[in-house]
Amino acid sequence: MRFLRFLKIFFTVIRFGLDEMMLSRVNDRRVRLLLRITTIGRKFDAPPGVRLRLALESLGPIFVKFGQVLSTRRDLLPVDIANELAKLQDQVPPFDSAVAIGLVEKSLGAPVDVLFDDFERVPVASASIAQVHFATVKAGQHAGKAVAVKVLRPNMLPVIDSDLALLRDIAVWAERLWADGKRLKPREVVAEFDKYLHDELDLMREAANGSQLRRNFAGLDLLLVPEMYWEFCTPTVLVMERMVGVPISQVETLRAAGVDIPKLAREGVEIFFTQVFRDGFFHADMHPGNIQVSLDPAHFGRYIALDFGIIGALSDFDKNYLAQNFLAFFKRDYHRVATLHLESGWVPPTTRVEELESAIRAVCEPYFDRALKDISLGQVLMRLFSTSRRFNVEIQPQLVLLQKTMLNVEGLGRSLDPELDLWKTAKPYLERWMNEQIGLRGWYERLKIEAPQWSKTLPQLPRLIHHALAERHDHTRGANDEMIRQILLEQKRTNRLLQGLLLFGVAVGVGAALARVFLALAYGG
């Protein structure tokens, strides 16, 4: 079966001329000769990126997902290919509703008619991983609640594991034979995709992500996140509050309903930067299909977030790196940007800061020919990542995910309001975060976090030091026995010498005193 799948991939490569794309970049002469033979008499009008996208679409949903993940790695791919892969969409027909109902009943341990009223047989959404049905909870504390029931596609894991095994094999060969193999790190990309895909297959993880995001925005009049109904959540079924809104892409519908579109654009950016710099936890799949706007009078004009399968997380170090890079960029302090890259530890220590600064200046300076409102922070990050390739910078996956999400947010914001000044909206968040981290308040907050641990550790410190020294002594005792013996011998010799000198000194002193007495008696002095 795996061999047949491999054959299909091979013939798809030939059909769409992907072998021709690889021809000039293959190291092995024999493979290059074979590829030349296969390309004789063939001509392709479509650009390479289009052919790659069509090939992935023909190979099915797993390869479509792989292409989508690959499109976010703009630090590795040429811009034209990354842009083309970004067009890949999950266009998968729904699976049989009877199968979906069977999966829900098996997962939740009760018939659908006992759990829900009005379980809609026709799904409202279908993708490569799962599909969604609307229903109403029948009994219990959530009785009467309108819900969305997300059901994982059946028998996904064997198919995914089989395709991932093939992708791993292809990655190994690509790294060996392709001139760009080591730079593009195909095995690392496949490993990242493996983790991403298996995370999406666990709906409990998605429910936890949604619950965290909801808690983060509780009390803020910015974002609506559906409540998760945990008694109905399992790794294969997720039941959450049903949210009704208008997709963000339907701008004219929103305008006709009276939504303040420029305000909506600004709030979208505020939501994103709140997630990034306040929470370090952000929705990383913010394309128009997952973002809606409520027209409910109680929440009119507020964003609704859906689908929490892909979430990014940033450490304080990551946030500091981003904030300082953006602030230095807008001050045109390219030396600081280069230094930040070196201080991150992601750049080889042999890199000359002046060379990196020069490359960054060449990338960034052209942006300042345009108005600040026309500068794309996502594009700046993307260009910086691309430049970093030349210096073998290890770009962290969470920052690449952030950059891809930032491009989505910017595109969404400017589709709503072409005059949106992203920098003006973002700058207060960056400066506030920097002040909170570096200022007295930041020091106080860190002290509050660390103080309980210090109060626990400090009384134990003498014992811990004694224990560590004793362990070190025991560990090194055998190796140092000879040295200790020599030191003791030397100490004994030194002691004998000191004793001799002391006795000699005493004798001299006593002798001198006796001599003075004798002379006094003899001469009557």
Swiss-Prot record:
Q: Which UniProt keywords apply?
A: ATP-binding, Cell inner membrane, Cell membrane, Kinase, Membrane, Nucleotide-binding, Transferase, Transmembrane, Transmembrane helix, Ubiquinone biosynthesis
What membrane topology does this protein have?
Answer: Single-pass membrane protein
Q: What is its EC number?
A: 2.7.-.-
Identify the GO cellular component terms for this protein.
Answer: plasma membrane
Instruction: Name a single GO biological process.
Output: ubiquinone biosynthetic process
Key word Oxidoreductase present in the record? no
Cell compartments where the protein resides: Cell inner membrane
Its main subcellular localisation, reduced to a broad class, is membrane
Q: Where does ATP bind?
A: 124-132, 150
- Domain spans labelled Protein kinase: 118-500
Give the pathway: Cofactor biosynthesis; ubiquinone biosynthesis [regulation]
What Gene Ontology molecular-function terms does this entry list? Answer: ATP binding; protein kinase activity
Q: Which residues form the active site?
A: 285 (proton acceptor)
Q: Is Transmembrane tagged as a keyword? A: yes
> What transmembrane ranges does the database entry give?
501-521
Q: What class of enzyme is it?
A: transferase
Listed HAMAP family: UbiB
**Protein family (similarity comment):** Belongs to the ABC1 family. UbiB subfamily.
* Entry function: Is probably a protein kinase regulator of UbiI activity which is involved in aerobic coenzyme Q (ubiquinone) biosynthesis.
Quote the protein name from its UniProt record: Probable protein kinase UbiB
The protein's organism comes out as: Paraburkholderia xenovorans (strain LB400)
Write the gene name.
ubiB
